[in-house]
């Protein structure tokens, strides 16, 4: 653990997926934001749920869009609500449709009003109804007109009257 902070970003960048996957939670916690940014995006798919939950909000917020896309959709439910609410709008926009479909209702509820407009329209359209009904009225108020237009009939029908009214539907 004491040797990890001494690794340069060039050293981190050449770690294999297997090496990244066996980093302990303590070792992951000691990585600087710059070191996390140096992890190859393809290596992130080897992180366990516990390892993902160990990452600080600062470490996650420092990740590139290719790193965000490097997570498997099956890993998405491991992110805590706090981690989700601290992602940048660029990172929110980087999630693939498949990744977005893996978000839990608690994670959807964790989006801030400044993050919601960054959710790509195609991701909104492909979210399940259990996900979309998890949006609060404050979050729905932050929807762009394009996001509202992308909602499917099933999604709209699943909303409460209050949610539909918030969207002007």
Regions found by a protein language model. Give the residues of each.
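General marker for long, soluble alpha-helical cores
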Residues: 1-169
